[in-house]
Every structure is written in structure tokens, then in C-alpha cells.
A protein has these predicted regions:
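Anionic N-terminal interaction surfaces
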Residues: 1-51, 121
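Acidic, Ser/Thr- and proline-rich intrinsically disordered linker/docking segments
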Residues: 2-7, 11-13, 44-45, 71-180
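Surface loops and adjacent helix of pleckstrin homology
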Residues: 29-30, 37, 55, 62-64, ...
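Conserved beta-hairpin
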Residues: 43-67, 71
Length: 180
């Protein structure tokens, strides 16, 4: 997990995560509320979007803010370090996905951070099946193959769910400046 995933700005000024080697983007979801809590109980919150890939979930804030002595603009959750993930569907309020992610040994001594992604606008009819399938593959230690990613572009679209399915992979424009 990382508070500083590599980001770049597209032509419209929107920040996107750079893809890792052999990583494919599956979906993007805007209007997300994100929260994570460190082992020493520092809380980081933001509003923005998530990117779901074959390797990780990345939250990117609409704008970075100073929180707990740090500049917080993004948070990366590698699927292989994710545990205790669950879908929360309260009677009142917005649905969310939450869980734990193991920190690197250099950061917080390898302890767990808790995280929560709240879907503040719209349903979860597209995000949830993709998330559950990724978790199933991870638990079985299966590689996520290209056919799974390609099958997502045939998903049924819920008009109440503003999720964007990637049909083509986002590319870093030649003129884009990498942000940190």
C-alpha cells in the first residue's frame, strides 16, 4: 500500500495512476468518499475517484489536502495485501466496501491500515461484481487473465451507477507531466 502511487495528468487535467507492468485498468468510479486509518489511528479522508485494475485499487482525490502532517492526494491498495474485505449495505446511508491492507515493513512496521470506499452517488451494480471476482481470483492465487478484463466491457449498465468500464487502456499523453 502506498500514499504516493505514481500519477499523471491527462489532457483535461484529471490525475490518473500510472499502470504497473502487466497491469490492466478495468474500471473507474467517480464521486467516491474514501477513508483510511493508520495503525496509530491517524485518519485520512477524501472525495474523488477509484481506479480498479488487475493488481490494485487506487483512490485519487479531487484535490490533495494537508492531513496529519502529510499531503494526501492518493492511496493505493494492492489486491495481494488486502484482507478482511467486505461489502457493507446499511439500511440507511450509502453502500461501501471496506477492509484492511498490510503496510510495508518500512512504513508502520508492517501493521494493517483499515480502509473504506463509500459509493456516495449511485449504485454498486457494476463495481461490486468486478470487485468480488478480483477477490475470488486473488484468494485462489489465480492470475487475472485478459479475457476477464475484456468481458467487463460487456457488462449491463445501471443508469444509477456512474462507473466507467475501460474498453481501451488509458495512455499517458506525451505532453503529460508526472505528478507526485
Amino acid at each position: 500500500m502506498s500514499f504516493k502511487p505514481d500519477l499523471f495528468e491527462d489532457e483535461e487535467g484529471k490525475k490518473l495512476p500510472l499502470a504497473n507492468e502487466n497491469e490492466l485498468f478495468i474500471l473507474q468510479r467517480a464521486k467516491i468518499t474514501f477513508q483510511c486509518k493508520t495503525p496509530d489511528h491517524a485518519v485520512f479522508k477524501g472525495k474523488g475517484r477509484i481506479y480498479c485494475t488487475t493488481q490494485r485499487i487506487i483512490f485519487v482525490a479531487e484535490k490533495g489536502t494537508a492531513q496529519n502532517g502529510c499531503h494526501f492526494e492518493a492511496f493505493e491498495i494492492p489486491l495481494v495485501k488486502m484482507t478482511d474485505e467486505k461489502f457493507n449495505q446499511p439500511i440507511f446511508g450509502a453502500c461501501s466496501i471496506s477492509g484492511l491492507v498490510t503496510a510495508s515493513v518500512e512504513l508502520e512496521g508492517g501493521e494493517n491500515f483499515s480502509w473504506k470506499i463509500t459509493f456516495a452517488n449511485g449504485g454498486t451494480g457494476v463495481v461490486l461484481p468486478v470487485f468480488l471476482r478480483l477477490m475470488e481470483k486473488r484468494k485462489k492465487k489465480e492470475e487475472i487473465d485478459i479475457t476477464f478484463v475484456q468481458s467487463q466491457k460487456k457488462a449491463f449498465v445501471d443508469p444509477n451507477d456512474p462507473t466507467v468500464i475501460y474498453i481501451a487502456q488509458p495512455t499517458k499523453p506525451a505532453t503529460a507531466v508526472q505528478s507526485s
